[in-house]
UniProtKB/Swiss-Prot annotation:
Binds 2 magnesium ions per subunit. The keyword Zinc-finger does not apply. It is an enzyme of class 3 (hydrolase). This is Fructose-1,6-bisphosphatase class 1. Mg(2+) 1 binds at residues 101, 123, 125. GO terms for molecular function: fructose 1,6-bisphosphate 1-phosphatase activity; magnesium ion binding. Belongs to the FBPase class 1 family. Its cofactor is Mg(2+). Its EC number is 3.1.3.11. Its main location: cytoplasm. The gene is fbp. One of its GO terms (cellular component) is cytosol. Pathway: Carbohydrate biosynthesis; Calvin cycle. It comes from Gloeobacter violaceus (strain ATCC 29082 / PCC 7421).
Amino acid sequence: MDTTPLTPLTKGITLYQHILSQQALNPDATGEFSGLMVQISLAAKLISRQLAQAGLVENVLGFTGETNVQGEAVRHLDQYANETFIRVFQNTNLVCLLVSEELEDPLPLSNQCPIGSYALVIDPVDGSSNIDVNVSVASIFSVQRRNPRATDETSSLLQKGTGQVAAGYVLYGPNTMFVYTSSQGVHGFTLDAGLGEFVLSHPNIRIPERGDYYSINDAYSAEWQPGTRAFIDYLKQAKSRGEKAYSARYIGSLAADVHRTLLTGGIFLYPGTVAKPKGKLRLLYEAQPLALIAEQAGGKASTGTERILDIEPKTLHQRVPLVIGSPYEVDLAVAFARGEKQTVVAGS
């Protein structure tokens, strides 16, 4: 029998064991954060089980007929996932407030909210339009401590991304994978359906310094700002400069595209356009958590002109452009966006 002591990065340990091992390293830990992470993983298991029945049972595919705060048609899966997160945290006193893509205002989840208590910020199902065609989707989350100096619930959550306690996503694909950081590296856990547990499969994920792939929706190229267009043209002409050619990859599911970029290197872009320079992705529950993961893995995340984690949100559902991935490609994209690099010349 192997009696080697478990550490937080022992491959094959469960997410629960990992969290408890991390907690043991902090003498001031109360167990609240550990409990919170376990409940997120429970929500993920429930959503994963529901997704596995898509097409076999009612109210997984298709629309509810309602419209959310974003002005988007609500899908059954969006509604189920949102209600699942609410259900697993309600009356636990682990989370005081829940912010969701599906809710206009913060939702109080506990009557007992001491100063500094946690808030959970989520996109319950990112890329839900893809489930009808059996493409990967994800839940994205961010854990914050409420600002005790704030005068109301909303302003208590409008914090820079550097203040996140933890961030992560659960990718529902060929398998279900829980990826998170609490600013101690990025770790990935794969759901073992037989055990019903997330098991450490990708300890200490590091993004390559430079990659071979770029990911962007080329259908919007006519609407890109000049810096974005010049950057993508530059990548496309790598071979003419005697460099290794880049390949394009685009799933159309944000967390899935970022996950691939995290593992293989390169860059993902969801830029602003001439008509919508402020972009489409939401800062608090899409850009901020993914940016923290990228930076903890050695990558970078920017709007094209500003570091994502330095942005102070003005509203709960604020939108931003997103450029995220390997340091080399992100720095290059930023140089083009700022006009510091403007021309594409063979051999440059």
